[in-house]
């Protein structure tokens, strides 16, 4: 069964959307294999976003993801990566369609509520990054 990593970012937690978002995944019959609330430190944030380290928004992104607690989870299911990304919507809240998580709840260009792995390869890397205890 395919796995993916999902991060409910600080604005999801602050706005009390965690239960609603998790409920959407459960209604699609995805299994929550692992879930935890944590604070992401700068080192972990820089590692996670290293692919955009040369972009002008990098420091703002790091400040945002480290600004408060996040909920990190591993979901499994049939074609879960593709399905979750479809449920999440476009990266920009303004480009996300109604019915998607970002389309329904997003209101800020930069604070976009949620991260979801974009491929099997990145999912496995991200799962090891945020759940290193599972790698033994």
UniProtKB/Swiss-Prot annotation:
Record has Acyltransferase as a keyword: no
Catalytic residue positions: 115
Keywords, ordered alphabetically: ATP-binding, Cytoplasm, Kinase, Magnesium, Metal-binding, Nucleotide metabolism, Nucleotide-binding, Phosphoprotein, Transferase
Domain of life of the native organism: Bacteria
Binding residues annotated for ATP, in chain numbering: 9, 57, 85, 91, 102, 112
Cofactor(s) needed for function: Mg(2+)
Subcellular location: Cytoplasm
Chief place of localization: cytoplasm
Record-stated family: Belongs to the NDK family.
Quaternary state and interactors: Homotetramer.
Protein function: Major role in the synthesis of nucleoside triphosphates other than ATP. The ATP gamma phosphate is transferred to the NDP beta phosphate via a ping-pong mechanism, using a phosphorylated active-site intermediate.
Protein name: Nucleoside diphosphate kinase
Taxon lineage: Bacteria, Bacillati, Bacillota, Clostridia, Eubacteriales
């Amino acid at each position: 069964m395919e796995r993916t990593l999902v991060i409910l970012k600080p604005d999801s937690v602050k706005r009390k959307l965690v239960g609603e978002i998790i409920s959407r995944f459960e209604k699609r019959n995805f299994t929550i294999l692992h879930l935890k609330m944590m604070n992401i430190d700068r080192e972990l944030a820089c590692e996670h976003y290293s692919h955009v380290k040369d972009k002008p928004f990098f420091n703002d992104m790091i400040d945002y993801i480290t600004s408060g607690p996040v909920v990190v989870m591993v979901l499994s299911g049939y074609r879960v990566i593709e399905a979750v990304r479809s449920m999440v919507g476009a990266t920009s809240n303004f480009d996300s369609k109604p019915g998607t998580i970002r389309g329904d709840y997003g209101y800020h260009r930069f604070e976009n509520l949620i991260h979801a792995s974009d491929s099997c390869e990145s999912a496995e890397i991200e799962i090891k990054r945020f759940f290193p205890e599972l790698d033994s």
